[in-house]
Amino acid sequence: MWIVHIPVIEDRVGVGHAVFGWLLLLLGAGAVAGMQGAGRFIDRVGARVMVPLSAVLCSAALILPALAVNAWTLGAALLVLGVGNGTLDVSMNSHAVQVERGYRRPVMSAFHATFSLGGVLAALVGARTLGWGWSPAVSLGAAAVFGVVAAVLTAPALLPGDATHGTAAGGKARTRTPRRIWMMAALALMVMLSEGVANDWSTLHLRDALDASAATAAFAYGAFSTAMTIGRLLADRVAARFGPVAVLRYGAALGAFGLAVAALSPWVPSALVGWALAGAGLSGCVPQLFSAAGHHDPDAIGANVSRVAGLGYLGMLAGPAVIGPLTHVMPLNLTFFLPVVLCAVAAATAGILRTPQRAPDAVHPVEEAPNRLG
């Protein structure tokens, strides 16, 4: 809902694109800060407590940008919204790890698929309310009320929390993040940077590099996001059969191939195929990384997920920002080979998702299937 109202709020506050771009960095900074703080609280009080609390915070903060009167108040509103969004993100993913543990099979990608579907639904509803002439305060306020009510009503259905008070089995407080988690976080940065590039530059690629009309160019993001949603609906079955390593390895490889096809294509139809292949390939990568991080240590689910999600989110923010300056030294389509290389690296190092054989603190309630694809 917030994304749909960006142009209207930007005009109402009276800031230009340049200033608004800087203000959006506060949204990202708040999200990363919220993710890191949420990880500690989740390990102390459990995801069952943090999910509804963070959902209420995020929902209530949704109306704040619509109430902003200048750049300063908009920046403060975006910072608070970012904290709420980041806190909710880690809380939901941590609880999804608990759900996987109960089912004893992969379900993380399904959660991410419903997130994508929710974004589509919110965009449609937001567009409709704008068409009715609703002000941002009214439509975002209604969305905030809906979010708070949904958080309260669904809270009893959440699984009992695994509060660990941030300690290991031996009672010692955990102060260091394992190297394996940081490696997963680095892979999340690479994959989510590639997603960010597709989200923000695929439409501009068709318009500026292939001279497509604005209406036709919009299909680039549509092809990418649709393929990603469908891929996430199927990724859990693939992970259950072939294992998470195969999902990340061959998914990242397909993502690299799709991005390369889009970058090198001289025609709009083949470029759309490339963006769709990229979306399908990348669809299951991030869920597998989040799941593996959460299952690494039952005493630090929140902390580990927050590290991977936080660094991944930085990649999502950095990717689009890096492409812009690169266009001053090379054509736009050639800049896409940066995410191509990163996806190739992710594919080559996917073995990090394998369960360490000598790791007494590693708990994987979702048994990894034999990796028939390597």
Where are these regions (language model features)?
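Short amphipathic helix-loop junctions that connect adjacent transmembrane helices
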Residues: 3-18, 200-216
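Short hydrophobic/small-residue motifs within alpha-helical transmembrane segments
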Residues: 28-29, 116-121, 225-230, 313-315
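Conserved MFS/SLC helix-loop-helix module at the cytosolic interface between two early adjacent transmembrane helices
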Residues: 33-72
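Paired small-residue
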Residues: 61, 72-81, 258, 269-277
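Symmetry-related core transmembrane helices of the 12-TM Major Facilitator Superfamily/SLC fold
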Residues: 137-156, 336-352
